[in-house]
């Protein structure tokens, strides 16, 4: 019976319950970015928490409504989840203040010049276009467990909080169980041939 439990646990570690986006399954690149009050936020300061890293533009028609969904998740797990929103030019302090007021944003909105999002979105001279919003789910050990890219249109980014909530809940249970996936992070995808 113990052998079966071990095999099932090992299987859960190798084959995650949720499919990961194409930018997942790797260590989250570190960053230190300022917010609108020029307070700096370092990703390492949030180690031990699950992070919803949302790369947005304030003019985006779906970014504010999705933020309300993420805030609901943060309120459900206040000591375990942190939301960080990242904006890039042409967004500025005035746009961000208005975005914060319009959508009652209670979590940090950080400013990037493009280098941080370039590393997260794996931008290159050949692949230089980015779509916003883009959400990254980072586990307590600093690994990108999943990512979601907005595919366009006027529909909401997330119709409900279910897809993200299910994954966050699974990560919280994993944390409470003592971190079945140790600091080595999630299983790495097989090498492409």
Sequence positions of predicted segments:
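Short active-site neighborhood of thiol/selenol oxidoreductases, capturing the structured segment around
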Residues: 41-64
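Short, internal strand/loop/helix patches
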Residues: 100-132, 138
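Thiol-/selenol-based redox modules, centered on thioredoxin-like
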Residues: 132-193
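Hydrophobic beta-strand anchors of alpha/beta hydrolase catalytic cores
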Residues: 52-53, 83, 135
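Bacterial N-terminal signal peptides
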Residues: 5-16
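Short hydrophobic alpha-helix segments
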Residues: 44, 121, 146-148
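N-terminal "domain-start" segment that seeds a small globular fold
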Residues: 18-43
């Amino acid at each position: 019976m113990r052998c079966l439990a071990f095999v099932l646990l090992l299987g859960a570690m190798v084959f995650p319950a949720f499919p990961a986006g194409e930018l997942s399954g790797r260590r989250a690149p570190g960053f230190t970015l300022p917010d609108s009050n020029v307070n700096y936020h370092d990703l390492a300061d949030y180690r031990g928490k699950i992070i919803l890293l949302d790369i947005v533009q304030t003019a985006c028609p779906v970014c504010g409504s999705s933020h309300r969904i993420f805030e609901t998740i943060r309120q459900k797990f206040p000591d375990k989840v942190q939301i960080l929103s990242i904006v890039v030019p042409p967004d500025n302090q005035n746009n961000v203040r208005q975005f914060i007021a319009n959508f009652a944003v209670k979590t940090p909105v950080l400013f990037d010049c493009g280098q941080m999002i370039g590393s997260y979105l794996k931008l290159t001279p050949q692949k230089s276009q980015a779509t916003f919003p883009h959400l990254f789910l980072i586990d307590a050990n600093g690994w990108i467990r999943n990512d979601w890219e907005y595919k366009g249109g006027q529909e909401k980014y997330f119709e409900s909080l279910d897809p993200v909530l299910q994954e966050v809940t699974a990560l919280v249970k994993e944390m409470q169980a003592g971190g079945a996936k140790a600091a080595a992070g999630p299983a790495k995808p097989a090498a492409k041939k």
